[in-house]
Amino acid sequence: PCQDQYIHEKYLKDIDPFFTCFLEHRRDWTDTITYMQRISPAEYGQVPPMSVQGKYIVKGERGGRISAKEEALRAFKDIGFLHDLNIVSGDAVSFRFRDENTRAWLRDVGSVLELYVYKACLDADIFNDIISSAVVRWDEVLGHASVINEIDVMATRGVVPLFISCK
């Protein structure tokens, strides 16, 4: 998920409808996002495609199978996160992600909650600064050996920090 304040400001109007989608489809949310990951795969280090065509049923965890969650896909289309959605029940699904950020959010099971908490902090109007997906590096080592933590949402009021982990 993005770290740029400008990007969040550009997407603020999308956060509540996205969270509403989550609430309406929360029972199947993990499968829905897993489906989005499987139908838009990327090799390690590669960027997932913007335009997607795939099977209606994909491989799930531990040999399971996940069917397209049609209602959730239509809800993503209704809020403008997907374009050109075409579902052939039992056979195939195709669509185009609106942009790189919505693609990232629809492929990350926790992004909806992080965005909602970020917006809640903004709406509270008591913080001087708010950032999501803040990365804290605890040493001088770069690369795989470095010690880092990702903080889902970090807000400050004066010199007092608030660290929020979304689960």
Where are these regions (language model features)?
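Intrinsically disordered, low-complexity Ser/Thr/Pro/Gly-rich regulatory segments
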Residues: 1-167
